[in-house]
Design a protein with these regions (language model features):
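A feature for loop-to-transmembrane-helix boundaries and adjacent hydrophobic helices
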Residues: 1-342
C-alpha cells in the first residue's frame, strides 16, 4: 500500500506517512499515541487551572483519569453501535482498538457522565469543574485529531481548493470513495490519488480557536458553567458544518442522516441561547449593582456636605487638671475664714 500523503497546493509532499511504529518489538499506532499525548497535555493543563483557581489538583487529576477511561470505552461503544452493519459480521473486530474506530461524541457523553457522577460523590460543583476542564479537553481534541491524518480518516468530498489533500485510493476503504472522487482520480508516478478536503485539519484548527477563546474568557466568566456551555455550543457549531462535508460519517440506522450532525445541531440549538441569555442577564445584574453603588456613594457625599463630621469642626479647648487647680479657690486661705479664726 502506498504510504504518501500530498498537499500540492501548499507545496507539501510526505512520501512516507506510517500508521504505526515499533519499539522493542512492540507495535504502537500513531493514532493512539497522539490521542494519549493530547490527553496527557490536556490533563496537565487542567491541573494547572485547578491550582490557579485554588482547587485541589489531586481531585481534578482523579476526575480526569476516571473520565478518560470511561470516555475511551464510550467512544468505542458509540462507534460500534452506529456501525453495527459491519461489526455484526465481524465480531472479533469489536475488540480491535489499535486501528481507530472511535466516535468523539460517544467519548464526550460518557466522559461527562462519569465526571458528573464523580462530582456527585465528592460533593463538588460539576459546573465549576467543567469550566476548569474544558480548555484542556479542547487542547486534547486539537492534538488527537491529527491521528486521523495518519489513519487516512476524517476527510471530505472531492475539492480543488488550494489546501486539498491527496491520498492514494488504495489507502482508504472502498466504501469511502465517492463517485466524484473516482471521476477526478489523479495518477502520479503510476499511483492513483483521490483529492479531498482535510476535515481533520478543519476540526483541529477549530478546536484550537475555541481553546484560545476559552483561555481568554476564563478570567471574565459571569457564572459557573459558562465556559462549559460555550465549549458545547461552539464545538457543536463547527462540527455541524464539518459533518456536512465529511464522507466517512456515522449514520442513524435506517437513514442517511449523520448522528454527529444531529448531536451537533442539538448542542448548538440548546446551549447557544442559554449562553446568550445568561450573559445578558449577568450584564444587567452588573449594571444594576454599579448603579446602586454609584447612588450610595453620591448619597454619602451629599450627607457629608449637609452634616459635616465632628472631626471637621473646631475642637473645644481641653481643660487639664492643672488648670482646675489654678482656678479653684483656696478655701483655707480665704479672707472670710481668716476673720472667723481671729
Amino acid at each position: 500500500m502506498e504510504m504518501s500523503i500530498r498537499f500540492p497546493g501548499l507545496g507539501l509532499v510526505f512520501d512516507y506517512v506510517p500508521r504505526s511504529f515499533q519499539i522493542f518489538g512492540m507495535e504502537f499506532t500513531i493514532y493512539g499515541v497522539l490521542i494519549a499525548v493530547g490527553a496527557l497535555l490536556g490533563m496537565g493543563l487542567v491541573t494547572l487551572e485547578a491550582k490557579r483557581n485554588g482547587e485541589d489538583q489531586n481531585r481534578y487529576l482523579d476526575m480526569m483519569l476516571i473520565s478518560l477511561l470511561v470516555s475511551v470505552a464510550g467512544s468505542r461503544l458509540f462507534y460500534v453501535a452506529f456501525s453495527w452493519g459491519f461489526y455484526k459480521e465481524n465480531l472479533n473486530a469489536i475488540l480491535d482498538f489499535r486501528n481507530g474506530g472511535y466516535a468523539l461524541y460517544g467519548g464526550l457523553l460518557f466522559g461527562f457522565l462519569a465526571a458528573a457522577v464523580f462530582c456527585r460523590i465528592t460533593k463538588t460543583s460539576f459546573w465549576q469543574s467543567a469550566d476548569i476542564a474544558c480548555p484542556g479537553i479542547l487542547l486534547g481534541q486539537a492534538i488527537g485529531r491529527w491521528g486521523n491524518f495518519f489513519n487516512r480518516e476524517s476527510f471530505g468530498e472531492y475539492t480543488d481548493l488550494p489546501w486539498a489533500m491527496q491520498i492514494p485510493v488504495s489507502a482508504v476503504r472502498s466504501g469511502e470513495v465517492s463517485g466524484a472522487m473516482r471521476d477526478n482520480l489523479l495518477t502520479i508516478n503510476g499511483i492513483s490519488y483521490i483529492q479531498v478536503q482535510p476535515i481533520f485539519l478543519y476540526e483541529s484548527l477549530w478546536c484550537l480557536l475555541l481553546f484560545l477563546l476559552l483561555m481568554a474568557m476564563r478570567r471574565k466568566k459571569k457564572y459557573e458553567g459558562e465556559l462549559f456551555m460555550i465549549y458545547l455550543a461552539g464545538y457543536g457549531l463547527g462540527r455541524f458544518f464539518f459533518e456536512w462535508l465529511r464522507i466517512d460519517k456515522l449514520y442513524i440506522p435506517g437513514t442517511k442522516v449523520g448522528i454527529s450532525l444531529v448531536i451537533s445541531a442539538i448542542l448548538f440549538a440548546v446551549f447557544m441561547p442559554v449562553v446568550i441569555i445568561r450573559r445578558v442577564m449577568a450584564q444587567k445584574r452588573d449594571t444594576i449593582r454599579r448603579q446602586r453603588r454609584k447612588r450610595f456613594l453620591d448619597e454619602s457625599v451629599k450627607e457629608k456636605k449637609m452634616f459635616p463630621e465632628t472631626s471637621e469642626m473646631k475642637p473645644e479647648p481641653e481643660i487639664r487638671p492643672e488648670m482646675d487647680e489654678q482656678v479653684k479657690p483656696d478655701v483655707g486661705n480665704s479672707p472670710t475664714n481668716s476673720k472667723e479664726e481671729q
